[in-house]
Structure formats: structure tokens, C-alpha cells
């Protein structure tokens, strides 16, 4: 009944297994990949014909994590998985980016790739396993895919690269000074296709070394998929790339001159309008059959690409007049919004980001529910890309995959320079509103985010800047690396290579390559140019702000207090009674974590002090010899019980009440009376012994010994 094919190798200290032929047999390609005890299933289906008029490649990738994979039940009212989480969205993009360029040019049939996490051992991250499963499923499906690809995660600890670090090693990268890198790489046998990383100020050489290490480490996986496909692959789908040479030749002859003139215009909107006019002029001269040809859009793109790329390769001139290494003009402004905690307007050429920082308390931390367990994040970065930023009318709604991905890239770039939570106990939310875009808006978000946080008073370890690099690589081997690319250079070029960091090193690197043949020499040149560009941008940013501003008057003030964990129960009280009383009495917000760290927040410093004192009175231990204010709670023949130092009670013996003989404490005291007492010590049972007669009841000061004697004589 089943025709199972199974292959296994030892990889990175774990067993990696690929299996097909038993599950999802009606899919064009189905593979279950297992690393350790983490199993991921990838299923591929594709349409056997393109839709009429289809002028793009409709590839859809869905990565989904099932809670049962880790033995968990989903939260929420419905108790089932709902819309994709941020991690699922980011992993879908992680799979999509390296495989998309490997489909045969001209293939426009719809392809659907669904990747499902079936089992998670809480050791091996499922994203790498998912990429391997997806690659294997595509390779055996028969779809015209020029893979396979391999994938690997690279860490960097104690000067050594580490293959596929454990989940725990990566989960708290910010809190682990020994682990300085989380890099995911995917590529073919001969070329790197995609890199995604966050780092802690690593050098260009260290980052390039990580890429080389990861590419070499994935080679056994690629070989394994090839062996696997030799046994399990279906017949290749009969597809021949369309021949549109005649159509392209006609389009070129009719409109190359006008299109070249349009690309010579330096202002984006003018250039876009001129390109549209050139297209319209060409279309006006085409026959109905040529206009209906589904390859017309491809012919236009090829013409535009040849003009832009040829000018750069042959003369080094870009469409906005810059050479290959120049960054566009930069203007940085801070404190642009009066009532926000921090704000910045970062403008680089025709790309602009308005970035706002808001400081919150522990209540504002994001709770992340993941397969490996719940966690909290005190740094959030949200990226918004409205249609008006590119002068278009379009969809407006919740953030899409691109916005989530760009926001995470900026988050990765900035998280390395954040202060420790113990030094700066605030939740930080950064929102980047892209108000203009002509390339590299995510890197504008990094620059604006750095300025905005410093404007809010966040003590960053160092300012961060980012720059997007591009590449033109021709078939004859000629190439050019471009600094600070425009939107057209991204769209028509061969590489999008974003690098962010401080003066000391790289904090984030993302690379997407559309062609094979990217050599180490090209990557070294790109990293070197990116460093020069980053240093220039940091210099321009420093003209607006070079260090953290004073703290915003509108931000909440927070003080932290660390208590023994065995005292947490006392501060919270039965059913939260004590903590509610503290909040209601003081007016401050109080947040307690399991480690005994208490954050007290309020816009009113007096409220913070009130809450602080109330908590301290509960958790602190009274000191022998100190004087405290208390209240008489009960009178008995042998003395008075006094409540002091929060909820503590102690006995003032009748002989310690006054400097005269008393027959009963009620001669000088009454219940509810406020008194000043000195802690004399503890009896053999640990009970508190208090005294009053040695304390001046008006001033609360201890009476000098000679005064006691005078009082006794009197």
C-alpha cells in the first residue's frame, strides 16, 4: 500500500531523516523531515497550467506550528490555532525567499507549499527543518525547480562558529553574552541564496566567516536531498520557457529611446510617470495579438532592466545620478512631535520614516505564546507602509507579511544595543511610519528608530544605522555593487543586501539573492561598501543627536526593587489583597515577576515612594536598636502589643512603657494610640521585644541616658 522512501544522515550531532510515500500521497510532493525529535511535513501542489493573462509567478508558502507538536493546547476561547503568529509569518518568508528565484524563468503556474510542524523536541528549531523539508518536497514534486537548497543555523560563541545551536541557546540571545550570533542561511550546492541574522557587533570578517561556515555545513543536506530525489522524484513537469524574443525585439525597437529618456529623470514620481508614458506609447503601436501576449509584461521588464543595468555596468551612472558608492542626502530631525516620549524624522533621498518611541511599564510587555513555552518581550518594533508612501492607491488594513518582516529586520538591528532590563526597566515600543519610500525603508526605520529611542532618553549602548546594498551581475561576469539602492535598483537588480550596525560592528544582516554565482569576492566588496556607507550615515545622524536626551516628562517613571522570592507571597497577599491595597493606596502600578523583581511605575514620584515604602515595610526585616512608629493594638496586664513595621506585632512589657512604675498599661496607653517604639531584641521563641520609655514620644528620638536618670529621679 505504501511505497516509502527514507534517507538519514548524521548532521550537527543529530540524525536528520527524510521520508516520503506514506503521508499525503495525493500531493505533488510530500516529505516529512525529522531532526532529533523535531518533525516537519512539507506538501507541494502546483497547477498544471497558468491562468490566462498571468504575468507573475504565484508562489504561496504557509508555515504553521501545531500546538500538539509540543504537547500543548492552544489558548483563547476557541482553543484552536487561529491567524498566523509573527514567527509563522517570518518563517513562511524565510522559506519563500531562497526558493522563489530557483523556479524556471517564465513558469507562472500557481504553486502552493504548506509546511506543518508535527513534533517539536524543544531542542532543534523547526524553521531549519521546515526549509529542508520544503526543499526536498519541491525537488521530488516534478515542478520546474532548480534546487535543491540546504539550510543551516549558525551561532558564534567564544570565537567559534556553532552549527544549529539549541533552542535555549538562541531563545535569550540578548541575555547571553557568550552567544553573539543567530544566523540562518540557505543556498544551493554552489551559491548562497539567503541570509537572515541578528548579531552583537560582529565584524565584517566574522559575519562573512559565518556565511561561509553555514554554506559548507549544509552541503551534506543538499547531497542527501539529491540522493533522496533519485529514488523518490516524480517525472519532471513538461514545461518549456516561453520564447518571446520576437516580442521583446519589437518592444525594444519601438520604445528603447523613450524608455531610456524616462530612466534619465532623477525624481521618482516624474520618472514613474515617464516610464508609464513610454509603455503606453509602445503599446499603442502593437497589434491586438501582441497586446494579448502574456509575455508582454516580461518583455517590458527586460527592456527596463537592460537600460538600468547597462548604464551602471558600462558607465557607473545610476538613475538618480549617483556613482555606485554614494549615499543619498540625509536629513535627521528629533523631537518632532510634542507629546510623544521620543520621535525622529529620518529622510534619505526620497525615502522617509517618521519613527516614534513610547515607554511603558511591565504591564505593556508582549506575551509570546510559542511551542517552546511562553515568554515576554519588553522591546517591540512595528513598521507601517501605507500606500501613500509610494504615491499609490492600494490596500489599507492590518500589517501584511512584508510589513511584519521589515519590522522584525529593524528589531534585530536595534535589539543588540538596548540597555539591560535591570538598568532600564521600561517596555519600549517603536513605531515606524513610512511616509515616503524609494528603496531601503527598513533601514530608514533602523536609523529613525535609533534616533527616536535616544530622543526618548533610552540609554542605547551605541547609535545604529543601516544601509541597503544592491548588485548588478551580468552573464559575462561583469558586476557592480551599489550602495543605498533605490526601489528600481532593488526590483531590477540581482541582490538585496541589508546591513545594520554600530561603529563597532554589525548587528543585523539580511541578504536575498536572485541569481547564482555570488562569489566571496562580491560579498566582501558588498560588506566593505556597506561599512563605509554605515559610517557615513552614523556621522549624518550624529548631527541631530549623538547620545540619549533627558528623560521625557510625559513618560512614566519606574523604580525597581528586588525582594527575596519567599517574600513574593507576602507582597501579593491572599487572592491579591495586599498588592491591590498597595496600588489603591499609592496610585502607582506595581508589577512583580517570579524572580522577585518589582517594578513600581507612575507619573507621580510621590506615588512611587508611597508604594515603595509600603512594599519595603512588608519585605524588610526590622533591625535591633532601630526606632519605629507603631500602633497599640491590644492592652494586657503585663504590657501592650504594638503593630509596627507593616504587619509586625511586638510586646512592650509594662516595665518598658514609662520611666515610672505602672500597675496597668491603660494608665498611659489606649488601643489605637500611635506610639514610638525601639526594637530591643527577640526572646528565645523569636518574639519581638519593644520598648517605649527610652524614646521621646513627640520627636521619635532616643532619650539620652542622663535624661533617663533625671526622669527616674524625678
From Swiss-Prot:
Which superkingdom? Bacteria
Catalytic reaction equation(s)? RNA(n+1) + phosphate = RNA(n) + a ribonucleoside 5'-diphosphate
Name of the top EC class for this enzyme? transferase
What single Pfam family name could you report for this chain, choosing any that match? S1
Where in or outside the cell it occurs: the entry states: Cytoplasm
Q: Which residues form the KH domain?
A: 556-615
Sorted UniProt keywords: Cytoplasm, Magnesium, Metal-binding, Nucleotidyltransferase, RNA-binding, Transferase
Domain S1 motif intervals: 625-693
Quote the cellular component terms of the Gene Ontology held in the record.
cytosol
Q: Does the keyword Disulfide bond apply?
A: no
- Function of the protein: Involved in mRNA degradation. Catalyzes the phosphorolysis of single-stranded polyribonucleotides processively in the 3'- to 5'-direction.
Name under which the protein is recorded: Polyribonucleotide nucleotidyltransferase
User: What is the native source organism of this protein?
Assistant: Cereibacter sphaeroides (strain ATCC 17025 / ATH 2.4.3)
